[in-house]
């Protein structure tokens, strides 16, 4: 799994050199932000069911046609799968907060997702809406410290951009 530390070391190793000062500063910055990332990961873990449910509801509110017969959210099974996928993305964001990099999102959430959704005839816009809702819902200091919210939002933006 990729983290800032493994990415920096791998890049330096591939170039046949020791990590540079700027490489080490990047690692140091990541370590300094670790407390904020862990705060965000803990809050998300404690509230993931509520956040996922609200995000799912926001997506369906914006795209009500998905509940029509034959659409991607027309049966209870499809609804459960959509809600599951949203929660899965949030869980991957939580894992990414813990490791301090996008590795979990890249490896388990983004790789091949467009092709899978396209082959199944599933629109990605509702997922984008759900993650956007989760991003816009967060508030500092009500929910998280400013730095924790910044770390959380950065990963949500990353996931949103990958689905867009």
From Swiss-Prot:
One of its GO terms (cellular component) is plasma membrane-derived thylakoid membrane. Gene3D superfamilies: Phycocyanins. It comes from the Bacteria. It is found in: Cellular thylakoid membrane. Contains two covalently linked bilin chromophores. Belongs to the phycobiliprotein family. Heterodimer of an alpha and a beta chain. Light-harvesting photosynthetic bile pigment-protein from the phycobiliprotein complex. This is C-phycoerythrin alpha chain.
